[in-house]
């Protein structure tokens, strides 16, 4: 998929770029796999703001994605490659031999007409899903489970990939996209290949309004707020922070401050921490 750049016909068009959507084969999703998606505006069930910079944006419908890939032994044919407004990756509609339809994350190189299958006996081919125990060392994988049967949780964004480095007893050693190397139960499943839409990270939003279409609200610096709104606020003109280190809006140290728990349960599975 290529990136289309605009001519600078206006300030908003200058440097703006979009995907050319060459891989997309239809603009009409499968209705049976749609679910309503209500906007929360970053609020929780008490109505309090828990995630800043969210709100507005174009209406969306949720596409129900099969992250578990548990339909073993039944071949499925790729019917369409579709855009999904809820994630950076594209999705593929799979028509299974028994008549069921499911969406999966579209790996790089997956095309309409390709036949995929899940299960321990599946071939090592892009789009097939297998337990880590059945995948050869060195294979590039994505959509990795952390608990058997829970569904893929790791490596799902556009262009991401992980690599299977080795197997030790009941665990497989996997290097994630962040650079972190960790053990994962070898009974957990993963899908072969790299997530598609690789050039997503090269897209330049170009103007503020396009962020608003996506439901992203402005990010205001703390130094331009009042002192009752932010620890950095107040003062005349461009005043310094006035504290030993930068603070979050709630007065906690930030920008380099370690927030991971000292004795977290998953520490014993992590061989090498992610890159800074």
Curated annotation (Swiss-Prot):
Part of the 50S ribosomal subunit. Forms a bridge to the 30S subunit in the 70S ribosome. GO terms for biological process: cytoplasmic translation. This is Large ribosomal subunit protein uL2. It comes from the Bacteria. GO terms for molecular function: rRNA binding; structural constituent of ribosome; transferase activity. The gene is rplB. Belongs to the universal ribosomal protein uL2 family. Residues 258-276 have a biased composition (Basic residues). It holds the Pfam family Ribosomal_L2. Residues 35-55, 222-276 are annotated as: Disordered. Keywords: Ribonucleoprotein, Ribosomal protein, RNA-binding, rRNA-binding. It comes from Shouchella clausii (strain KSM-K16). GO terms for cellular component: large ribosomal subunit. Transmembrane segments: none annotated. One of the primary rRNA binding proteins. Required for association of the 30S and 50S subunits to form the 70S ribosome, for tRNA binding and peptide bond formation. It has been suggested to have peptidyltransferase activity; this is somewhat controversial. Makes several contacts with the 16S rRNA in the 70S ribosome.
